Amino acid sequence: MAVTTRTVSEICAAAKRAAWELAAAPTEVKDAALEATARLLGERSAEILEANAADLADERAAGLTSALRDRLTLSEARIDAMAEGVRTVAALEDPIGEELERKALASGLGLRKVRVPLGVVAVVYEARPNVTIDCAALTIKSGNAIVLRGSSYAERSNGALAAIVREALAEAGLPEDAALLVAGGGRAELAELATQEGTVDLLIPRGGEGLKKSLQDVATVPVIYAAAGNCHVYVHADADLEMARRIAYNAKVQRPGVCNAAETLLVHSDVASEFLPGALADLHSAGVELVGDERARELAGAVEVGVATAEDWGTEYLDLKMVVGVVGSLEEAVDHVNSHGTSHSEAIVTSSEAAADRFTTGVDAAVVYTNASTRFTDGFEFGMGAEIGNSTQKLHARGPIGLRELTTYKYVVRGDGQVRE
């Protein structure tokens, strides 16, 4: 089984031993493990769905919002998508061993800088079982072992998926302990995982501000926060308004419970009276609850728009709710995004290259779009096959965390007897 009775410390130590072996594995062996994972996902789909149904029926899931239940829910289509994502990762170029630099030193030594795995990557995530497979695929391909700590809501689903990964590793001749799942979803296990210096090389928590804050005070291992996404769509004065309506609708409605969904719509005052009635009617018809500033409410037409509070502008709803504001200039839009955003994904709709350039250089975010939905911030969409999360930090990775973001480098030096004088 993927879930063991070992302590967190024992799990991380076992993963470290597995990581040493996996780091030296040839590309074809790692790819064989991934192909086996994809195949087993199809063969075991009934078992996976049974485990997922039990999670959804559990009383612990009864109070989940519709968005969180959507995150927790698996289907044949989502399992097929997971398998396809694994195959895509298998087909990607292996980053391990890539030569980043080569030079001859004055001492006569030959120096090479080569890409190597991080070692053990621990991932903490909430109610999205597909993360189990996405993360495992990326870590296997990049030569890392993984320790997974999922939500208690998805305990059965995660267990079924992690067991498949372990079986696939063994089938390929790799150590099963390269993929381990920590049982229990309590704070004690989380705090212990965050303090495994010497065995955990990187911790990636995927979740909201509550998870981030719970780790900031205790973590002693390196952490990359795949944190909240309070994303904005800004409609500039010269925007194609039909395009802007499609983008705003897609960014909010297509899948509201994910971190790259838009939470705020900003509109330039020059086009607000023309744009807002239709755009807000679109959103309202999709069940989006709308709140806004005074100007947006005045221009909403027949659509009911509530009063936005100060907290609304900084909230990641992860649901069918959106805050709407009218701004007087591009500079005001940039200032608003930088003041209230989470450095995740931001979008401008404009026909002006100058406006696009000002927005993309002025906004402090991992991903900035011109004339496109924020929903594209995703490892699969970016050609990475999958992602472990989206980093809103600037060190060690920013944006989707794919294969190369799960590596570091070492210097390999070759001599013929040199000693330093």
How would you describe each model-predicted region?
Residues A91, P95-E167, A172, V200, ...:
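Conserved small-residue-rich beta-alpha loop and adjacent elements
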Residues R102-K103, L111-P117, T139-I140, E171-P175, ...:
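Solvent-exposed alpha-helices and their adjacent loops that cap or buttress functional pockets
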